[in-house]
């Protein structure tokens, strides 16, 4: 553990940010899995609604720097192919 006051504060902030980022990533992954599950069950109406939600979460994660912008675009593209197939 750090001894200097500013280093202690930075370590605390880092841990808080890590937990927050993990939460956002988890929500994003859950949204993607929901879309994939709905597509496999041939529930296309609900899959389209879930796709909108997942798309927003992917974009937000990319904007915040949690995932790369191209990774978000790739995941959205693959999900869109599944939903529209």
Swiss-Prot record:
Keyword Transcription in annotation: no
Gene designation: rpsT
Family membership: Belongs to the bacterial ribosomal protein bS20 family.
Stated name of the protein: Small ribosomal subunit protein bS20
GO cellular component assignments: cytosol; small ribosomal subunit
One Pfam entry name: Ribosomal_S20p
Keywords: Ribonucleoprotein, Ribosomal protein, RNA-binding, rRNA-binding
GO molecular function term, any single one: small ribosomal subunit rRNA binding
Stated role: Binds directly to 16S ribosomal RNA.
Keyword Flavoprotein: no
SUPFAM superfamilies: Ribosomal protein S20
Biological processes per GO annotation: translation
Residue segments, region Disordered: 1-25
Top-level taxon of the source organism: Bacteria
């Amino acid at each position: 553990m750090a001894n200097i006051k500013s280093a202690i504060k930075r370590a605390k902030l880092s841990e808080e940010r890590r937990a927050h980022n993990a939460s956002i990533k988890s929500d994003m992954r859950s949204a993607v899995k929901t879309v994939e599950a709905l597509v496999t069950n041939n529930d296309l109406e609900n899959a389209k609604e879930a796709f909108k939600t997942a798309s927003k979460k992917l974009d937000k994660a990319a904007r915040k720097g949690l995932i790369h912008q191209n990774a978000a675009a790739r995941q959205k593209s693959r999900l869109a192919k599944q939903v529209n197939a």
